[in-house]
Amino acid sequence: MAAIGGAVAAVFPFGSERFVKLREQFWLAMFHEAAEAGHSVIFTFAPEASVAPDFPDRARQAVEAAGGEIIFVRLTLSRDEQERRIGNPDRAVFGKLRSLELLRQLRDQFMASEAAMPPAALTIDTGTTKPTAASRLIADRFNLTRG
């Protein structure tokens, strides 16, 4: 999904009103179409100020309107590990935050955004679980199929 954010960011600055609007329109349309087609989707995002607090509710509505089901999973990472990873070059490829100073400045905002998220049916520590293993764990736990 980072490619979508990158495509939108090529036209509108990250976090701008139009960036947020277009990114969210794509996300919601993709959820709806995938649910309608019977495709399971594992989608991740970091709760932060550019994601509307009611986004999870609207995502649920988009999926359920197409006959699908949405399950929330929480991915966690320790502060130390997050700070260790923040400067990794692969983060630039996905347009992710890379400044340790900015991360520290925004941490309270991130925590407030995360606190507003719906309860998770599963929590995974990404410090000890690689991305492929996490996606397999999610798919297996909730019997997800490709459709």
Protein language model regions, located:
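Short loop/turn segments at beta->alpha junctions
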Residues: 78-79, 130
